[in-house]
């Protein structure tokens, strides 16, 4: 008897899967401990002290109690993904320290996760509010530390609470019972006033005062609204997740007189919790710290040993030095755009990124025959408003500064994640009026190159490009419908119906091109579902000439989602999908399996692509399915369009009519093959001086995307890259955190190269890795939780 009979072959589980399963029991214990911390209660602090007249620099308010749990570990060890266990088992507010971290969590949890800044009410106008320089005095208690941290951030805090008091009614939840409050928590998303468990991913990138700000806003909001959390004295539990050795926190103060940023290192939230003895004792760090040990992103044992060496600041063995030498290639190969095509270059400085992109664009522009990697330019417009700019110049004593000089010195501040600092762009024109000065830059993009978003951006999905088989797989899987139907499913079914309606012609066109009369005859004879039939009877179609697709003589246009009921839209979509699949099966029978993999495109309107990048149409505008684009997904740049795109904003376009005429919408393709237009990014630059004077100086319009061809190591944090080429350049005394972040982006050690051995250039010692000694101490402490 065959021993395999009745057995099912199973794939061997991956090392990453095994590592995740072995950590399951310890993760459960972490959840239980955080649950216990969240049940701690106290006498509610009297928040009436903290009014708009209060100033912690001069006044002493009541101490705001809190608890904390720290989750740290090597890069790729599963810290962020383990947050899903908290999300599934506890009522908690999940946040990220950055937009990338928040979007990463949102995708993993399939639930909206804000940044911690958004959670406590931070707005764009607060970016340029200067932090106060608080005199440093000896802080010997947790109360003194909290007061000091709160005083640093108080100008921003007061502006946020002023707006909150204006928008929220005092005592709004005073009459709400405990059961009604629990129902409210389940109905809506988590907030600082619906949960006392606040999770912050990538907390090591936050300045230490943000921890105190979160604690303050938790108590203030719950006190103002008079929630059951406040009445019961529920102490907030702040869960801080991150890797203290791969992150640094910096604070920047803009010097208006010299027009430059003054950047200095500061304590981050993790080192604040680990390194401040008063804080560590208060939160009982030994019992409330979990360390993830093994890297699950890249499971190569030697690579994991490298990360642990950097994590714990261990001595570098000759064997490890030899291992890193295997990744070293000549610097000229990494800087040559023709080498390592498709790999992501990582650099230390923005100038190095910009130089590489400029070299790449020069190579592409000299190759006129390259269609798939065509280089094209789009304008970026900065508009400086004359009146507030003149007032600002007088206030800072720079009366001779011109708008162009100001824009040149402030480009890096005009867009998220220093997009302007990385772009290969140059001034191509200025337009001066009495009201403003418009400065136009030309920025370059490469067709079919990968890019990520630099902020929260709307997209209008307007088409699909790929193969017939790929499109059919998407329709059969219905994942697209599931992932986009949470707001209004009617629009999703209407969108797909429009794509299907317009896609039918491709079968007829292929038959005509091939001169295949039998296929065209069979195509006409395919039955059309009753849900698609227009008011014109089938008899009216008989006798029509065969020079057009009979489907369009028979079928009605897809019903509008604003006028048709959902069942009608679903019925039309089902009928259109059935007919598309029948036509595809017919084409496969006549033309063979290769037809399934042939080129296929469909759009919501008739589109023609000129010069390979310019999407044009005779339609007055471009419509589609509007959604927010994910900042962690990678998009392929396809080109641009000057067609007016409807992004679903009731107030109209975010750009002025003048800027809209100058700036097109960038067209991209996602990993599934769907084509979308991205809404242009609008940045309003507001300068806030120390005295509180505010000047609305500038408005800039750009495209909100950043090339994945090259980026800084700092920007790459939190991103997994399939192919990585790192250039450490001519830098010396490289920070250990930069080396750690750079090499740990790789998901496969076989696809990692670098231009030098960073271990020979890296600063060593406790000063460079201050948290390593605390981590090593924790590894030897039986009270801490180790997760392998």
Swiss-Prot record:
GO CC terms in record: host cell nucleus
Pfam families: Herpes_Helicase (PF02689)
EC number, as in UniProt: 3.6.4.-
UniProt enzyme class: hydrolase
Keyword Nucleotide-binding: yes
Keywords: ATP-binding, DNA replication, Helicase, Host nucleus, Hydrolase, Nucleotide-binding
Family: Belongs to the herpesviridae helicase family.
Name of protein: DNA replication helicase
Taxonomic source organism: Human herpesvirus 8 type P (isolate GK18) (HHV-8)
Gene: HELI
């Amino acid at each position: 008897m065959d021993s395999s009979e009745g057995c099912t072959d199973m794939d061997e589980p991956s090392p990453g899967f095994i590592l995740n399963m072995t950590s399951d029991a310890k993760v459960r214990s972490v959840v239980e401990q955080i649950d216990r911390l969240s049940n701690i209660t106290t006498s509610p602090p009297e928040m009436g002290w903290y009014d708009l007249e209060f100033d912690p620099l001069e006044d002493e308010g009541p101490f705001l109690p809190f608890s904390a749990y720290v989750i740290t570990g090597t890069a790729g060890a599963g810290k962020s993904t383990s947050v899903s266990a908290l999300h599934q088992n506890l009522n908690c507010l999940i946040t990220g320290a950055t937009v990338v971290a928040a979007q990463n969590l949102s995708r993993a949890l399939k639930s909206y996760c804000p940044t911690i800044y958004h959670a406590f009410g931070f707005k764009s106008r607060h970016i340029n509010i200067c932090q106060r320089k608080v005199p440093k005095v000896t802080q010997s208690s947790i109360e003194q530390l909290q007061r000091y941290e709160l005083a640093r951030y108080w100008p921003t805090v007061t502006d946020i609470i002023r707006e909150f008091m204006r928008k929220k009614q005092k005592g709004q939840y005073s009459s709400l019972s405990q059961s009604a409050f629990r129902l409210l928590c389940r109905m809506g998303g988590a907030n600082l006033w619906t949960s006392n468990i606040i999770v912050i991913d990538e907390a090591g990138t936050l300045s230490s005062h943000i921890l105190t700000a979160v604690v303050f806003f938790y108590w203030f909001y719950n006190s103002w609204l008079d929630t059951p959390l406040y009445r019961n004295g529920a102490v907030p539990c702040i869960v801080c997740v991150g890797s203290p050795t791969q992150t640094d926190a910096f604070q920047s103060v803009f010097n208006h007189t010299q027009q430059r940023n003054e950047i200095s290192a500061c304590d981050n939230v993790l080192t604040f919790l680990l390194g401040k003895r008063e804080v560590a004792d208060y939160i009982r760090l030994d019992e409330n710290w979990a360390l993830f040990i093994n890297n699950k992103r890249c499971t190569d044992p030697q690579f994991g040993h490298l990360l642990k060496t950097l994590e714990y600041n261990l001595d570098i063995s000759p064997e490890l030095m030899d291992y890193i030498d295997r990744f070293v290639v000549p610097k000229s190969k990494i800087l040559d755009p023709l080498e390592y095509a498709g790999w992501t270059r990582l650099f230390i400085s923005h100038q190095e990124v910009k130089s590489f992109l400029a070299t790449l664009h020069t190579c592409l522009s000299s190759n006129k025959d390259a269609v798939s990697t065509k280089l094209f330019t789009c304008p970026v417009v900065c508009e400086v408003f004359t009146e507030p700019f003149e007032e600002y110049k007088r206030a800072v004593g720079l009366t001779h500064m011109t708008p162009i000089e100001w824009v040149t010195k402030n480009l890096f501040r005009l867009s998220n994640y220093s997009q302007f600092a990385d772009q290969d762009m140059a001034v191509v024109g200025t337009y001066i009026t009495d009201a403003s000065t418009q400065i136009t830059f030309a920025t370059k993009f490469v067709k079919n190159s990968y890019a990520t978003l630099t902020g929260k951006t709307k997209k209008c999905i307007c088409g699909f490009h790929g193969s017939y088989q790929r499109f059919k797989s998407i329709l059969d899987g219905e994942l697209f419908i599931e992932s986009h139907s949470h707001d209004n499913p009617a629009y999703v079914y209407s969108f797909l119906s429009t794509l299907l309606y317009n896609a039918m012609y491709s079968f007829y066109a292929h038959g005509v091109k091939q001169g295949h009369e039998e296929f065209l005859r069979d195509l006409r004879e395919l039955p059309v579902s009753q849900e698609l039939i227009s008011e014109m009877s089938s008899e009216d179609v008989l006798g029509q000439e065969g020079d057009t697709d009979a489907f369009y003589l028979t079928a009605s246009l897809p019903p509008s989602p604003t006028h048709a009921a959902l069942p009608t839209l679903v019925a039309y979509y089902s009928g259109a999908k059935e007919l598309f699949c029948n036509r595809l099966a017919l084409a496969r029978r006549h033309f063979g399996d290769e037809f399934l993999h042939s080129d296929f495109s469909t759009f919501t309107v008739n589109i023609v692509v000129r010069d390979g990048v310019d999407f044009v149409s005779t339609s007055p505008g471009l419509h589609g399915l509007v959604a927010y684009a994910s900042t962690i997904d990678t998009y392929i740049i396809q080109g641009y369009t000057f067609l007016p795109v409807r992004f679903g904003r009731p107030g109209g376009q975010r750009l002025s009519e003048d800027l809209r005429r100058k700036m097109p919408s960038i067209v991209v393709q996602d990993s599934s093959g769907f084509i979308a237009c991205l809404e242009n990014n609008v940045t309003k630059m507001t300068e806030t001086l120390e005295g509180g004077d505010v000047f609305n100086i500038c408005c800039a319009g750009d495209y909100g995307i950043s090339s994945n061809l090259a980026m800084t190591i700092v920007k790459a944090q939190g991103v997994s890259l399939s192919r990585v080429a790192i250039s450490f350049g001519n830098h010396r005394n490289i920070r250990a955190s930069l080396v750690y972040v750079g090499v740990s982006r790789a998901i496969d050690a076989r696809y990692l190269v670098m231009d030098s051995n960073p271990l020979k250039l890296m600063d060593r010692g406790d000063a460079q890795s201050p948290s390593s000694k605390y981590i090593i101490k924790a590894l030897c402490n039986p009270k801490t939780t180790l997760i392998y």
